Structure formats: structure tokens, C-alpha cells
């Protein structure tokens, strides 16, 4: 074969490809690494699901109990608090006023304002909220009811700008939510789920460019620029030196009568501040904080019918229906007539008697067959005085089923003042009866989730979603389990636990009942014989009337503490323990998955490195074979000079040998 033909064959094309070690090809993703990532994602997902077990439990509890008990709005965990209506006040017939005053050195000047409030009333003309600037400036913002519709009027230095919603009638006694926003001279207004009503006054087209330019204007010159723009006839945009927020309209001659809930203005929750006796808040007139007045005993049958009919609606609408349409049994005909015929008074679930707003007499309880809602009053039936400051919430009552179902620790049991023997009442004498199941409504702070309505929102959008009616209640149902027989007499029986009396509990405002005051247990009686159990058994608080016990000395309603020291409570605390264990499981799962991924990654790197060395050796062997197999080409030419070296060297050696 000619050399040229051989050179143009397959031989000359191989050496360039196999002349040296090639760079390793990009390796495919190792299978163990992919498996490790999948395991990590699976572990994280499992931990997330386990951490939400309590949420699933609450939702299941909500749906499975809706036929017999009122909705427990605060039964949901912390993440679902966006539906909380906030603090609620009742404004009486005589008119009332809640005033929040900014300190003189802390008065804000805003270019954008947000206002949201929920209310219910039968009035066709009233002023709900008014925000005024410092004296002499004349800026203001007012939310009012005119001819049964909601409107807002504001002035930030140019002219009065009005915006209203004529299609939504709010004087029907139902619960309505109003959302208002202002940006310069522009404004939007929305009532309930009606379309957003927008207002763009004339002369506002230059405000966007002005807003951009105003960022470069020093603050001390802002007022001068505004005055100059006022002379030019342009719309001003800043609400200067806001001095006070007034709720109720009493100072405007158009007092509001009804219910106001969860008022929110630029991050301030004025009603919550009023309930906490904030020094910047002043209250006057016929005003009542929801939770202070007498309660309403709702019939179980009526409540079940109402909830089943409105279960497709939101929690706010369902609670409103329950509050405005339920009637009660076991009352006198006069009170029944006032419930069904009085249209000026508001019936608020768990807060109000269906009587005149100025009548503060306590509701009379009925006997049996009804849901017992908390009566947050003391034993005395005297009407509480009308508060000139923000009213306080008296200590809550003591419910034994609540202590049994939620998880009664020693610091949740009542003081000795409430532990007096009593006879009669359902589920009083025999505690072993598993059919003694009483639905009890109590504060929502007892299920392991702490909520303080005075906390600021996470963002402004939280207060632009839904505003349910009254949510300072949680309905709990005691578990259907055998309970020990507790003796109410002091003669014989198992030793009880008596708590040392503590100082009288101070009056607590609404939303501040999540503190813990531990009480020290003291042995009351020693064991009387070998057959008597030695375990401490809490005595059941005797009732003041059938099914309800009022404990004026009850210190505070604590929250469950899953990580705190002390004795472990009854089975009601399992829910809190499950939340703690789920958090621990999530952490352990994430750590284990991360360690597994690291091990898999190290193993994959080790295998990949070994595979690279083997491929390099194989390349060298192939190069050696290809070089030895070739007899022509460049390789042979390189080795050609080496051939004559051997004879010349041998010749030299021969010469040396010859001469020697």
C-alpha cells in the first residue's frame, strides 16, 4: 500500500484524537445525589406537615362540631388571625366618644392614609370617625353615614373632597366593613364586597411629578412649597400635623349609636388602645366594651339551625347571623318581646342582653338545654358604673369543664373563694358519668395559641381582608372521658388540693388575659386509709347557679405552656405537646436529611475522582498501542534519529575495545 494512501486512510486521523489525555467529559448527575435531594425535600415536607397537625386538628374540630356549638373563631392557630375583628365597643343612645390624641411632638403628616372599620347600626345619619389636624391648619378626614349610606369627606389644604357609596345601605343593623384609602387628593372607598369606588379630583395630574420632585425638597421647606402650590391652584397632598382621632361623632352633634369593631388607622388600633387604658386615649359617654356587659344564653337548637343555614358563608357572616337572629328560651315574655321587636338595640353574641343599651341589668339564666356562654361579671347584680375612662374587663368566671377539657394545671384551678360546696346543677354530683358533656365558651387563649389584639398588624393588608363580628370567645367542649369522683364535702374522700389565697387580681383590660400567676398547692387533708388514693385530685368548683360558676377572685386565665416546668396537666394539654413534638421532629428531620445529603455528596465525589484516574490510564495505554502499531507517519520520523545512535555507540565501544 502506498504511503500516501495509508496516510489518507484512518491512521492519520487517530493520532490527533488520541495524542494525549483528553479532558474528562461532563459527568451525569450522580444518582445518589439526586436521591439525597429527594430525601431532603421529603423530610422537610414531612416536618412541615407534622408541624401543622394542630391546624388540621382545629379545622376538623371546627367542621365536626358546627351542629351543636357556636363557632370558635379564636380556635384557629396563630397564622389564621387575619380574620380577627379586634376590640369591639357598643355606643349607647346617649352618645359616646373615644378620642386618641397624639403627643405634641409626635404628630404625623401623611401623604397616604388608610382607614378600616367594622360597624353595625340602625341610624341613617351619624359620624363614625373623624381625624383632625392641629388647630389653625384645617386639614381633616371624616367617615360618616348619610341617608343610610357611607361617605368620606376630607380636606388636605385645597378643597373638600367627598367620596361615597350610594348603592350600599348600612343602616340595616347588619355588620358592615368599610375600607378607605387616600393618596394625595385621590381616594378609594369600598363597603363590604361592593366594587371599589374611586375618586380623582380635577387638577391632580401634576401630583405624580410633584411627588417625585418633593423628595428633593427639604422638610423645613415643605409647607412653603405647599402654600405656593395653593396660590397656584394645585391640589395639595399632605395631611399636616394630625392631632386627634375621634370615634363616635358626639363632638360633631351627630352621635353614633351601635357597634364599632376593629378600627384601624395608619397602624393605630384605637379601640384596642382604649381597652388597654392607653394614656393617650380618653373615653366619655354611654360606652361599653364588649365582654364587660351581661352575656346572652343562646339556645343550642337555634344556634345549630343558624350555623347550618349559613355554613357556606364566611366566619364573619356566620357569626353576625348568629348574633342577630338567635332567640333565647326560659325568659319572661317581656324580655322575649324586647328580643324580637326592639330594632334600635344590638344583640351581640356573648356580650349583650337584648335590652336597651342604657339598661345594664344582668341577664337572667335559664335552666338546662342551653349553651352556657361566659358571664364576665362579678356576683353582684348591681349595674356597673358608666366609665369616664376606658372600661376594664372584670375577672372571668370559672368553668370546671373548661379546666378539664383544655388541660387544667395547678395554676388554672380556682382560688378558695370559688371552692364552696353546692348542690344541684347538671354534672355536679357524679363526675364518673361520661354523658355529662357541657359545651362551654371561654377565652380563646386557652388552646395553646396566644393572641393579643393590641399587636400591630404584620402589614397593612391584614386589615383589608375580613372583619368578623366578635371574636373574644372560644367555644370548647369537654372530652367524653370518665372523670374521677370528686367529693364536695370535707368529711371523707380523697385528699384535695387547696391553693393558698393570693392577692386580689387587678382588673385586666381586654386582650391582656394571657399572663400566668402560679398558685402554690397546699395539702388540705392527709390520706384517711390504705384504700384512699394518694394522688392529688382538684376539687370541682361549686356553681353559683346551675351550670355556671362565678368566681370574682379568679386571678387570670393563663395560657398553656408546652415548655414550661412544673407538673403535667390532664389530657387536654395533648394538643400543645403535639405542637412541641412536631417542632422537635421538624428540626431533627432537617438535620438528619442534611447529614445524609453530605454523606451522599462525599461518596459521589470519591467515586467520581476514582473514575477520572482510571480513564486517564486507559488513554495512556491506548496511545501506547497506537504508537507501536504505526510504522509510518510522524511518529516513525521522530524515532528515526534514534536508530543510528545505537550503531555509532556500538562502534565507539568497539573502537575503545580495539584501542585498549
Swiss-Prot record:
It comes from the Eukaryota. It holds the Pfam family Laminin_G_2. O-glycosylated; contains heparan sulfate. Heparan sulfate attachment is required for synapse development by mediating interactions with neuroligins. GO terms for cellular component: cell projection; glutamatergic synapse; presynaptic membrane; protein-containing complex. Residues 1-27, 408-458, 537-571, 627-660 are annotated as: Disordered. Interacts (via cytoplasmic C-terminal region) with CASK. Specific isoforms bind alpha-dystroglycan and neuroligins NLGN1, NLGN2 and NLGN3. Interacts with CBLN1, CBLN2 and, less avidly, with CBLN4. Interacts with CLSTN3. This is Neurexin-2-beta.
Amino acid at each position: 500500500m502506498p504511503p500516501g494512501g495509508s496516510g489518507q486512510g484512518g491512521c492519520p486521523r487517530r493520532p490527533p484524537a488520541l495524542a494525549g489525555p483528553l479532558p474528562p467529559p461532563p459527568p451525569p448527575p450522580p444518582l445518589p445525589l439526586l436521591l439525597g435531594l429527594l430525601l431532603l425535600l421529603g423530610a422537610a415536607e414531612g416536618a412541615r406537615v407534622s408541624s401543622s397537625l394542630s391546624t388540621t386538628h382545629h379545622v376538623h374540630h371546627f367542621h365536626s362540631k358546627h351542629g351543636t356549638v357556636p363557632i370558635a373563631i379564636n380556635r384557629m392557630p396563630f397564622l389564621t388571625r387575619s380574620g380577627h375583628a379586634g376590640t369591639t365597643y357598643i355606643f349607647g343612645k346617649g352618645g359616646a366618644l373615644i378620642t386618641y390624641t397624639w403627643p405634641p411632638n409626635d404628630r404625623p403628616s401623611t401623604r397616604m392614609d388608610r382607614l378600616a372599620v367594622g360597624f353595625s347600626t340602625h341610624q341613617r345619619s351619624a359620624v363614625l370617625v373623624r381625624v383632625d389636624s392641629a388647630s389653625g391648619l384645617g386639614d381633616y378626614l371624616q367617615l360618616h353615614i348619610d341617608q343610610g349610606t357611607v361617605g368620606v369627606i376630607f380636606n388636605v389644604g385645597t378643597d373638600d373632597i367627598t367620596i361615597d357609596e350610594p348603592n350600599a345601605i348600612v343602616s340595616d343593623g347588619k355588620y358592615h366593613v368599610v375600607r378607605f384609602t387616600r393618596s394625595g387628593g385621590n381616594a378609594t372607598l369600598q363597603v363590604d364586597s361592593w366594587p371599589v369606588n374611586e375618586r380623582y379630583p380635577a387638577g391632580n395630574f401634576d401630583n405624580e411629578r410633584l411627588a417625585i420632585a418633593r423628595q428633593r425638597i427639604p422638610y423645613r421647606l415643605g409647607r412653603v412649597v405647599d402654600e405656593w402650590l395653593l396660590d397656584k391652584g394645585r391640589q395639595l397632598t399632605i395631611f399636616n400635623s394630625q392631632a386627634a382621632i375621634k370615634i363616635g361623632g358626639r363632638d360633631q352633634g351627630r352621635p353614633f349609636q351601635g357597634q364599632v369593631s376593629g378600627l384601624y388607622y395608619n397602624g393605630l388600633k384605637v379601640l384596642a388602645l382604649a381597652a388597654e387604658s392607653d394614656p393617650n386615649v380618653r373615653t366619655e359617654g354611654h360606652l361599653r366594651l364588649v365582654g364587660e356587659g351581661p352575656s346572652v344564653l343562646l339556645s343550642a337548637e337555634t344556634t345549630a339551625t343558624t350555623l347550618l343555614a349559613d355554613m357556606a358563608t364566611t366566619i364573619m357572616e356566620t357569626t353576625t347571623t348568629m348574633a342577630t337572629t338567635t332567640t333565647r328560651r326560659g325568659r319572661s315574655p317581656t324580655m322575649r318581646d324586647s328580643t324580637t321587636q326592639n330594632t334600635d338595640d344590638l344583640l351581640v353574641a356573648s356580650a349583650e342582653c337584648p335590652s336597651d343599651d342604657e339598661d345594664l341589668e344582668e341577664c337572667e339564666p335559664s335552666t338546662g338545654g342551653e349553651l352556657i356562654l361566659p358571664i364576665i361579671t362579678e356576683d353582684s347584680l348591681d349595674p356597673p358604673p358608666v366609665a369616664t375612662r376606658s372600661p376594664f374587663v372584670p375577672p372571668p368566671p370559672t368553668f370546671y369543664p373548661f379546666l378539664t377539657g383544655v388541660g387544667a394545671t395547678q395554676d388554672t384551678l380556682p382560688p378558695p373563694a370559688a371552692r364552696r360546696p353546692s348542690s344541684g346543677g347538671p354534672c355536679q354530683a357524679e363526675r364518673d358519668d361520661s354523658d355529662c358533656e357541657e359545651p362551654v365558651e371561654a377565652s380563646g387563649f386557652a388552646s395553646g395559641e396566644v393572641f393579643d389584639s393590641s399587636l400591630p398588624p404584620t402589614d397593612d393588608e391584614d386589615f383589608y381582608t375580613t372583619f368578623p363580628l366578635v371574636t373574644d370567645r372560644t367555644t370548647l367542649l369537654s372530652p367524653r372521658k370518665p372523670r374521677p369522683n370528686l367529693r364536695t364535702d370535707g368529711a371523707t374522700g380523697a385528699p384535695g388540693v387547696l391553693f393558698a389565697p393570693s392577692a386580689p387580681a387587678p382588673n385586666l383590660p381586654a386582650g391582656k388575659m394571657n399572663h400566668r400567676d402560679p398558685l402554690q398547692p397546699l395539702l388540705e387533708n392527709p390520706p384517711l386509709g390504705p384504700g384512699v388514693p394518694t394522688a392529688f385530685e382538684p376539687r370541682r368548683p361549686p356553681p353559683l347557679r346551675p351550670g355556671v360558676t362565678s368566681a370574682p377572685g379568679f386571678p387570670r386565665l393563663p395560657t398553656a405552656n408546652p415548655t414550661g416546668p412544673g407538673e403535667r396537666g390532664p389530657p387536654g394539654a395533648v394538643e400543645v405537646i403535639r405542637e412541641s413534638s412536631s417542632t422537635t421532629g421538624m428540626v431533627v428531620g432537617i438535620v438528619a436529611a442534611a447529614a445524609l445529603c453530605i454523606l451522599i455528596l462525599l461518596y459521589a465525589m470519591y467515586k467520581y475522582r476514582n473514575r477520572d484516574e482510571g480513564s486517564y490510564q486507559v488513554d495512556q495505554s491506548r496511545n501506547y498501542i497506537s504508537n507501536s502499531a504505526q510504522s509510518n507517519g510522524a511518529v516513525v520520523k521522530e524515532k528515526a534519529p534514534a536508530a543510528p545512535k545505537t550503531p555509532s555507540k556500538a562502534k565507539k565501544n568497539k573502537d575503545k575495545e580495539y584501542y585498549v
